[in-house]
């Protein structure tokens, strides 16, 4: 593999560990790290968190959050290569303490000037070789030659990106299977949930359920307006067609609800700027076991709670956004192997900072 390649995103592969940094998200960030460690440690996967003082592995119970200049989205800044090197976006104020990383993992670190953020591409196994899936918007801010130089001899396949980065919209698994957010599937699931809630309410006249129905209808109107304004359905349809044309197995899932903002991100189209995510189950960590089964770790959304979808009500009407996401993966990932991590505080922080679990962690492959 070429030393010129800087990539952070993988399809589902066996992991040795995942690495993140204390980017100033507070105590609840460590709670998310601890939950993730509890899940992945059972699979033989370690979770590393870098603080301003040291790197801690797996046990975060006694940590007191401290201020740091660390950039929180490690996925976009740091890459653990299969050729046993680490590459960083640059030795900037947000990328201090790289020496600690080098010593912890006994790997050399290399600075990359011509950097492409890891959230906008994935390496995918295709016929035993790695190819690159790259968000097409990179072509608007980088020259094709610089992109090819960046990825070396590897084939680069550009894809339409409905969102700021590809890892916010798709999640590659293994065997060329790719989860793709599907707004139409989400809307169908929401409609069915509203229908069942109305049927139960007609029998029970439960005031809590009445409030849930009202909130679900409001959310539906909000999603429809957003889909129309930003042409969401056509964007995802185009992406799915591109993947199918290139012989990927597209698995549609109801994994994302966006609330586009009005800000501007340098070098990015306006429609993708300052996006907020009411729910994002796409931006996830996936570990492949020896038997090829998968463990899926996504960030928990506060949306179900905000809608009043308690476990009891969700069971009664057979609907919540976590439930319909799990159901969409029947026969692909076992329900007990799909996890949603984080508390209300960190979920809101991630939602308001335009990222989620995959953005937080850099994956360390088994060498």
Language model: regions and residue ranges:
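Histidine/cysteine-enriched polar flanking segments
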Residues: 4-367
């Amino acid at each position: 593999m070429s030393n010129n390649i800087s990539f952070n995103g993988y399809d589902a592969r066996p992991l040795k560990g995942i690495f993140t940094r204390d980017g100033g998200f507070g105590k609840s960030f460590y709670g998310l790290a601890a939950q993730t460690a509890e899940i992945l440690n059972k699979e033989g996967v370690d979770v590393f968190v870098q603080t301003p003082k040291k790197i801690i592995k797996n046990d975060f119970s006694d940590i007191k959050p401290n201020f740091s200049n660390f950039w929180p989205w490690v996925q976009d800044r740091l890459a653990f290569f299969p050729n046993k090197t680490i590459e960083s976006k640059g030795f900037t104020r947000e990328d201090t303490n790289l020496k600690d990383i080098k010593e912890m993992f006994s790997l050399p670190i290399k600075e990359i000037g011509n950097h492409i953020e890891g959230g906008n591409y994935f390496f995918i196994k295709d016929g035993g070789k790695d190819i690159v899936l790259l968000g097409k918007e990179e072509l608007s801010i980088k020259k094709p030659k610089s992109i090819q130089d960046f990825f070396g001899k590897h084939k680069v396949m550009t894809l339409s990106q409905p969102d700021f980065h590809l890892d916010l919209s798709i999640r590659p698994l293994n065997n060329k299977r790719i989860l793709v957010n599907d707004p139409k599937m989400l809307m169908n699931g929401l409609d069915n949930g509203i229908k069942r809630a109305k049927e139960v309410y007609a029998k029970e006249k439960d005031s809590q359920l009445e409030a849930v129905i009202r909130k679900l209808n409001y959310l539906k109107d909000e999603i429809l307006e957003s889909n129309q304004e930003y042409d969401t359905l056509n964007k995802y349809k185009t992406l799915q067609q591109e993947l199918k044309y290139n012989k990927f197995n597209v698995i549609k899932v109801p994994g994302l609800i966006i609330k586009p903002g009005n800000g501007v991100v340098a070098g990015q189209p306006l429609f993708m700027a300052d996006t907020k995510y009411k729910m994002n189950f796409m931006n996830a960590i996936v570990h492949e076991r020896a038997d090829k089964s998968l463990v899926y770790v996504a960030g928990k959304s506060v949306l179900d709670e905000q809608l009043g979808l308690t476990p009891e009500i969700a069971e009664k009407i057979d609907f919540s956004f976590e439930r319909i996401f799990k159901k969409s993966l029947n026969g692909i990932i076992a329900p007990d192997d799909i996890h949603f991590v984080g508390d209300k505080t960190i979920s809101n922080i991630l939602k308001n900072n335009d990222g989620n679990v995959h953005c937080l962690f850099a994956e360390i492959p088994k060498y």
